[in-house]
């Protein structure tokens, strides 16, 4: 019995450390998902250096409290999988959201974004953000538009003087 208790204590300590180091944590229900589908999601997430694991809710609850994420406690019900990203803030939410569109049994419940507890709405908002490249393109276009307008105006002024 002592070995089993020690193993659980070790799991809580390990998960607490992961929670503290994570940039993003996404928790989702996987009820009714086949092993093959869960494995394919795991491999997709692994390509982006994102850990996916299923923990018992009691272990997840204790680790969340130890990491200072007490507000997660009410959402820790039912079969949950935990995706943890240490590098990219947006990737786990995007990948799981895309996967959930194909597999209706997957439901994002809550998570943590840069050390702040986030509900389903916040995680979905993060998942629906355009990619970094798209945002940079939009920013560049927005910055260049006034310059373009000035150039067109100057050209028109030069043409009227000629």
Curated annotation (Swiss-Prot):
Q: Do you know which Gene3D superfamilies this protein is assigned to?
A: 3.30.70.1730
* A GO term from the CC aspect: large ribosomal subunit
- TM ranges are none
Recall the GO molecular function terms of this protein's record: large ribosomal subunit rRNA binding; structural constituent of ribosome
Gene Ontology BP term (one): translation
* Keyword vocabulary terms for this entry: Ribonucleoprotein, Ribosomal protein, RNA-binding, rRNA-binding
Q: Does the keyword Ribosomal protein apply?
A: yes
The record's annotation in NCBIfam families points to:
PRK00099.1-1 (NF000955)
Q: How does it assemble?
A: Part of the ribosomal stalk of the 50S ribosomal subunit. The N-terminus interacts with L11 and the large rRNA to form the base of the stalk. The C-terminus forms an elongated spine to which L12 dimers bind in a sequential fashion forming a multimeric L10(L12)X complex.
Q: Which family does it belong to?
A: Belongs to the universal ribosomal protein uL10 family.
Record protein name field: Large ribosomal subunit protein uL10
What species is this protein from?
Acholeplasma laidlawii (strain PG-8A)
* Gene this protein is translated from: rplJ
């Amino acid at each position: 019995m002592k070995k089993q208790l020690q193993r659980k204590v070790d799991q809580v300590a390990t998960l607490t450390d992961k929670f503290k180091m994570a940039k993003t944590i996404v928790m989702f229900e996987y009820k009714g998902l086949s092993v093959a589908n869960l494995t394919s999601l795991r491999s997709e997430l692994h390509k982006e250096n994102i850990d996916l694991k299923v923990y018992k809710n009691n272990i997840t609850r204790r680790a969340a409290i130890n990491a200072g994420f007490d507000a997660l406690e009410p959402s820790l019900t039912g079969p949950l999988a935990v995706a943890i990203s240490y590098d990219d803030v947006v990737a786990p939410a995007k990948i799981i959201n895309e996967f959930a569109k194909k597999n209706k049994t997957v439901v994002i419940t809550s998570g943590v974004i840069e050390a702040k507890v986030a509900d389903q709405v916040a995680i979905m908002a993060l998942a629906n953000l355009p990619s970094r490249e798209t945002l940079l393109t939009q920013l560049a276009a927005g910055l260049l538009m006034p310059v373009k307008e000035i150039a067109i105006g100057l050209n028109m002024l030069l043409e009227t003087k000629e």
